[in-house]
Amino acid sequence: MEDPKSDEKFDIGISEKNLDVGFGESSSVDVPVKGRFASFLKKLELSSGPEKENIDLRPTPPDRRHYSALDIIYLWSCNGISASAFRTGTSYMEMGLSPKQALAALIAGNVFIAMPMTLNGLFGSHYHIPFAVQSRASFGYYFNTLIILLRFIAGLFYYGTNVYTGAECVQTILYAIFKSFRSYKNRLPADAGITSDFLISYFVYWVISFPFHLIRPEYLQRFFLIKSISTYIACFAMLIFLLCNVGSHVVWDQPATVSGRSWSWVFMCALNSSVAGFSTLAVNVNDFTRYVKHPKTPYVQMLILPLVAAVSAPIGIVSGVASKIMYGTAMWDPLQIANNWTSRGGRAAAFFMGLTYLVSMIAQNISDNTVAAANDLLYFFPRYLDIRRAQVIVIIIGAWAIVPWKILQNGTAFLAFLGSLSIFLGPAAGIFVADKFKNHHKYDIDEFYNPSGIYRYNKLGLNWRALIAFLCACVPLIPGMAMSINPSITMPDGVIHLYYIGYFYSFMTAFLIYWGLNLVFPAKETLLEEAVYPPKSNAELVDPSTLSGKDKFWYYIDY
């Protein structure tokens, strides 16, 4: 086994041989072409030192840890109040729940998902490494590639669908500024899946959002603050407008349309959906918590996630019910409501509503999708990609190559597949949490970068305990996933009901099996007496027991 303290301790596991595949002597490409291509690749290499260390895969140094507890609050509060988040509560009402029941499902789901997000987030706040590197400890030095690919695929497609929502924001702005834009002539064929005016809106959104993806994640906290404040102001303004027109009792007195045993399973399905909505973040939350100043900062997620659901979900529910009364159609999207404001004053309000949600969608897409997908992508190409280059690739592929408007228009089966990815990400989150308890949160930061170290487990770089736990958790849910993708497939009620609680089942099953296997067959080399951490920041060197009064209060707020 290699010495983890050697000069190669921060090698990320991609060898020179692996990086140069196709350029060896066995290559059939002629020498001139090979030479030009090799020269081109050489120019693309990052200038990160003689050892080709990628700083975005290395532990975040103290001088790049800028996030405080308030910044984490801004980060997640801006997600819960976005335009896409508003649709969730109303979709549960369409399933048959009453407004109060839909709200209860959302809050309960956020309470549950806050636990794995906090526990996995603590890994990032202590060891300051991205999810892609962290996963080596649980799945093995090479088997973690499976989970990274799943997360990358999810982030790529979710980015594209969110760009579509961002385009709706731009469309609302253009409708408000240019009255004639509503009747803009469509010059695209019907099978294009998109109209000319919306394609313009789509392109404008992508161009506006592009520069924000060039900002390194550790410097985005002020952007999240601005977004949170502006969006909450806009949301409460719309809430007041709707309630003044229809009254609060009309909204909350709506009855459920299902009852008995059917209601129970509909409620469980809604509860599972509210949890699964955060399934990607529960896996890769440390892509952001790696930038926090203090190791205890992620604990604020236990409070902020349920609180955001309790504040934002009622606004979406009110929008759906009130819009049906006012306009004759239930509009679960605040942008659709704003598009009905056609008077001079109404268009001004619609402009500010669209602008607010435009900023909101840019922030949400960064925090939910592009940073995570970029971290996953640069993991495979560490010599050539940093977080900025990787984000540029993600936003080009996600916005244009996968053609998200086609998916949203005709891709019902594919959207069902995207929604079912939580049955694979749930086991990953469960295994991460179980691994944290199994190791008593003691890891060796150097070993994460040692290809022959303790987190390799065997010659294959595979932790078989994680493989068994993963398969036991997700395989029983695959028939239900197949049914959701292709409704013509018939399944027994038991299979359907198991799929309705898929995230709960997959998370808990993976957690218990992985925990049990490690009790019976422990990987003793990974059980450390003392943890090995990266260098500590100034915040970590302060002993809060020596502080009192307002100094202690601001210590926890600022750090």
From Swiss-Prot:
It is a multi-pass membrane protein. GO terms for biological process: amine transport; nucleobase transport. Its main location: Golgi. Disulfide bonds: none annotated. GO terms for molecular function: nucleobase transmembrane transporter activity. The keyword Membrane applies. Keywords: Golgi apparatus, Membrane, Transmembrane, Transmembrane helix. It is found in: Golgi apparatus membrane. Belongs to the purine-cytosine permease (2.A.39) family. This is Uncharacterized permease C1683.05. It comes from Schizosaccharomyces pombe (strain 972 / ATCC 24843) (Fission yeast).
